[in-house]
């Protein structure tokens, strides 16, 4: 792909997201979603192959269906209220349709089937955009309409997403699919707190983007796409492997790493709102995620697949400039929780 065309596509993706996040008009919001979708499809097919074509087609069909449902909900709401304002949601049917459309765009269960398949079919940089930047626009719209969303349905979807995100990743060896199921589970945590404290949901999104970006950048740097290739990075880049392990454990929510912070705050907030059964179930189901991250850490750090002798000592020739660039992002992704008391004392 021509670099100039690629820059234009990335600019359009960012512009579409900014239109959605800053607009208070339903038509402009829908227009931003369409700009975003039409620009991301060529990016997913950047490395042309039958697998990437299939992934881009699945993504396009899912997002186009969600956009049609969203437009139907907008028209129904306009018919009953006579206004294009986002915050003015008076019709129950329109509210339900908008919830379904946005959860389809986010990849929440039971509309999650496209997320692992599309992520596995695209390259690592495209997967990074898909699992981080593409979550911002739907979540910002949910943030604006959370007061009119059906709370019980959203909580049921969130619990189902946490469960499927944990179970789906248990038997996976492909790192992109593991990251996709992790994304489904994290989206479930964000939706669970959205109806009680939407600001906390945005904080969770920010931490999730930091952790997922760190993990994908480490995978891109080490060219790892499976458990086998990740285990061989000990010979190529020991520092990268150590960073990957701590980032994986942070994604699993193991204290005292950064990933434990949003789970801790969400469970605390749900308990304050007299909800006991839901946070208990969420904490139990989160152990599924932690289990496959621990298994991945074990297979990477404590075991080593058979390898050729010519792969040894390659770490001496690695470029350390990229490591220094990634260091701040990885520090935030792993050590934000232990550093929090120090930041409070400094202030």
UniProtKB/Swiss-Prot annotation:
Swiss-Prot/TrEMBL GO biological process terms: mitochondrial electron transport, NADH to ubiquinone
Gene expressing this chain: MT-ND2
GO molecular function: NADH dehydrogenase (ubiquinone) activity
The family this protein is said to belong to: Belongs to the complex I subunit 2 family.
Disulfide bonds: none
Main localisation: mitochondrion
Location(s) in or outside the cell: Mitochondrion inner membrane
Purpose of the protein: Core subunit of the mitochondrial membrane respiratory chain NADH dehydrogenase (Complex I) that is believed to belong to the minimal assembly required for catalysis. Complex I functions in the transfer of electrons from NADH to the respiratory chain. The immediate electron acceptor for the enzyme is believed to be ubiquinone.
Organism per entry: Crocidura suaveolens gueldenstaedtii (Gueldenstaedt's shrew)
Protein name in the entry: NADH-ubiquinone oxidoreductase chain 2
Any one GO cellular component localisation term in the record: mitochondrial inner membrane
Keywords: Electron transport, Membrane, Mitochondrion, Mitochondrion inner membrane, NAD, Respiratory chain, Translocase, Transmembrane, Transmembrane helix, Transport, Ubiquinone
Quaternary structure and partners: Core subunit of respiratory chain NADH dehydrogenase (Complex I) which is composed of 45 different subunits. Interacts with TMEM242.
KW Transport (keyword) present: yes
Catalytic activity field: a ubiquinone + NADH + 5 H(+)(in) = a ubiquinol + NAD(+) + 4 H(+)(out)
InterPro entries, alphabetized: Complex_I_Subunit_2, NADH_DH_su2_C, NADH_UbQ_OxRdtase_chain2, ND/Mrp_TM
């Amino acid at each position: 792909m021509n670099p100039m065309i690629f820059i234009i596509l990335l600019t359009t993706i960012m512009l579409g997201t900014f239109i959605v996040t800053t607009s208070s008009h339903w038509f402009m919001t829908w227009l931003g979603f369409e700009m975003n979708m039409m620009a991301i499809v060529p990016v997913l097919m950047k490395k042309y192959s039958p697998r990437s074509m299939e992934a881009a087609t699945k993504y396009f069909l899912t997002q186009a269906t969600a956009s049609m449902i969203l437009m139907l909900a907008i028209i129904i709401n306009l018919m009953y209220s006579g206004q294009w304002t986002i915050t003015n949601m008076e019709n129950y049917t329109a509210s339900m349709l908008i919830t379904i459309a946005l959860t389809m765009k986010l990849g929440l269960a039971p509309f999650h089937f496209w997320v692992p398949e599309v992520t596995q079919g695209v390259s690592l940089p495209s997967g990074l955009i898909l699992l981080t930047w593409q979550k911002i626009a739907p979540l910002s719209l949910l943030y604006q309409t959370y007061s009119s969303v059906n709370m019980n349905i959203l909580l049921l979807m969130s619990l189902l997403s946490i469960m499927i995100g944990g179970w789906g990743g248990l038997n996976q060896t492909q790192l992109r699919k593991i990251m996709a199921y992790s994304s489904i589970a994290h989206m479930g945590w964000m939706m669970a707190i959205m109806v009680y404290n939407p600001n906390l949901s945005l904080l969770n999104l920010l931490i999730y983007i930091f952790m997922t970006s760190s993990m994908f950048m480490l995978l891109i740097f080490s060219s790892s796409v499976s458990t086998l290739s990740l285990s061989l990075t000990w010979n190529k880049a020991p520092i990268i492997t150590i960073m990957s392990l701590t980032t994986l454990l942070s994604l699993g929510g193991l204290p005292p790493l950064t990933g434990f912070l949003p789970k801790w705050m969400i469970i605390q907030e749900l308990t304050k709102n007299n909800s006991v059964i839901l946070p208990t179930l969420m904490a139990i189901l989160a152990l599924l995620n932690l289990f496959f991250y621990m298994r991945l850490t074990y297979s990477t750090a404590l075991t080593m697949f058979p390898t050729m002798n010519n792969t040894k000592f390659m770490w001496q020739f690695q470029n350390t400039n990229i490591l220094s660039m990634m260091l701040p992002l990885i520090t935030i992704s792993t050590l934000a929780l232990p550093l929090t008391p120090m930041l409070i004392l400094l202030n």
